[in-house]
Design a protein with these regions (language model features):
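Beta-propeller fold detector
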Residues: 12-15, 52-57, 92-96, 148-152, ...
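Blade/loop signatures of beta-propeller domains
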Residues: 1-12, 39, 132, 190, ...
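Short loop/turn segments immediately following beta-strands, especially the blade-tip
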Residues: 181-189, 272-280
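A short loop-to-beta-strand structural motif that recurs across blades of beta-propeller domains
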Residues: 41-43, 81-83, 136-139, 178-180, ...
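Residue-level marker for isolated small/hydroxyl-bearing positions within beta-strands
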Residues: 35, 75, 120, 172, ...
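Short, solvent-exposed loop/turn segments at conserved positions within beta-propeller repeat blades
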Residues: 37-38, 77-78, 124-135, 174-177, ...
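Beta-propeller domains
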Residues: 29-56
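Beta-rich, blade/repeat-based domains predominating
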Residues: 10, 15-31, 57-76, 80-81, ...
Length: 282
C-alpha cells in the first residue's frame, strides 16, 4: 500500500448533511460534481471548497462521467435514461429504451476512448411493477446511438470501469458481493466473464461493491464494506481506506488526478494518493 498511499495521508471530510450522495466526477475546469439522489440535485464542489447547486431537478441523477469533449454524461434514475449536458446547458437523452422497452434505472457509466458509453442498468430506482425488461443489463452505447446489450446475468450490476488499456471491463455485482471482469473484444462487446474479487467482510460496517475506478497502473478501487478496497490488477487485496460512513462511489480529482474524492451516505471526503487515476473520457 505504501506505493499507493503515504503513511501520513489522512481522509478529509469536505461537506456533510446530504441525503444520499453518489456519482462524483472531476471536471478539468477545477470543480467536482456529485449527485444527491433523493434530493434530486447535482451539486458542484468548487475550488474554494464551497458547495453549490449545479442542477435541480436532476432526474434523480446517480452516476456521472465526462465524454471526450468534457460534456457531462449522467445516469438518471427518475427519468430512466442516460443523458448528456450540452455546452449550452441543454440536457438531451442519449438512451432510455432497449428494443422498445424502458430501461430500469441507469446507475453508473464510463466512456471508452472511442466515444462509446458503457453503463449499468439495475433496478435501484424503480419498483418491480415499473420494470419492463425483465433483466438488469450492462450496455454499450455507440457514438452513432446504437445500443447493444452486453451482459444480462448479473444480479444487480453497478459500478463500471475499464483497465488502463481498455482490454478489460470491470463491473460491480453489488448484491452478490463481488467484482466481475470481462475481456473487451475489438468490436466493443465483452466476453470471458469471470470473478475478479469478492468484497465480503462481516466484521466491518455495511457496504457492498458499488462505485468502481482504476488507476494508471491498473489497480482497482471499489467502495465496499468499511470503505474503499484497493486491489491489484490480478485481484489481490492491497489494502483499504477506512471511511466512517458507507462509501458509495469515488472519482479522481485535481489536475494531477492523485486526489481520490469519495462520496458516502451523507458526506463528501477526499484523500491524497501517490498514483494518478485514469482520466474520465480518456
Amino acid at each position: 500500500m505504501q506505493r499507493i498511499l503515504d503513511d501520513s495521508a489522512k481522509l478529509e471530510k469536505l461537506a456533510g448533511d446530504f441525503q444520499f450522495i453518489e456519482g462524483p466526477i472531476w471536471h478539468p475546469d477545477g470543480f467536482l460534481l456529485f449527485s444527491d439522489i433523493p434530493a434530486n440535485i447535482i451539486y458542484k464542489f468548487t475550488s474554494n471548497q464551497q458547495v453549490e447547486v449545479f442542477r435541480r431537478p436532476s432526474g434523480k441523477a446517480n452516476g456521472n462521467t465526462l465524454d471526450k469533449e468534457n460534456r457531462l454524461i449522467t445516469a438518471e434514475h427518475e427519468n430512466r435514461r442516460v443523458s448528456r449536458t450540452e455546452k449550452d446547458g441543454k440536457v438531451i437523452t442519449l438512451a432510455d429504451r432497449y428494443e422498445g422497452k424502458r430501461l430500469n434505472s441507469p446507475n453508473d457509466l464510463v466512456v471508452k476512448s472511442d466515444g462509446s458509453i458503457y453503463f449499468t442498468d439495475p433496478s435501484y430506482g424503480v419498483s418491480k411493477d415499473q420494470e419492463e425488461l425483465g433483466f438488469y443489463g450492462v450496455y454499450r452505447l455507440a457514438p452513432d446511438g446504437k445500443l447493444t446489450l452486453l451482459v444480462k446475468d448479473l444480479v444487480l450490476p453497478n459500478g463500471i470501469a475499464f483497465s488502463p488499456d481498455e482490454q478489460k471491463l470491470y463491473v460491480n455485482n453489488s448484491e452478490a458481493g463481488y467484482i466481475a471482469v470481462f475481456d473487451v473484444k475489438p468490436d466493443g462487446t465483452v466476453t470471458n466473464q469471470r470473478l475478479f474479487a469478492e468484497l465480503k467482510d462481516a466484521a466491518t460496517k455495511g457496504g457492498v461493491p458499488d462505485g468502481l475506478k482504476v488507476d494508471l497502473e491498473g489497480n482497482v478501487y471499489s467502495t465496499g464494506p468499511g470503505g474503499v478496497w484497493i486491489l491489484s490488477p490480478d485481484g489481490k487485496l492491497l489494502g483499504r481506506i477506512s471511511v466512517p460512513e458507507t462509501a458509495t462511489n469515488l472519482a479522481w480529482g485535481e489536475s494531477d488526478r492523485k486526489t481520490l474524492y469519495i462520496t458516502a451516505n451523507t458526506s463528501l471526503y477526499r484523500i491524497r494518493l501517490k498514483i494518478a487515476g485514469v482520466r474520465a473520457g480518456k
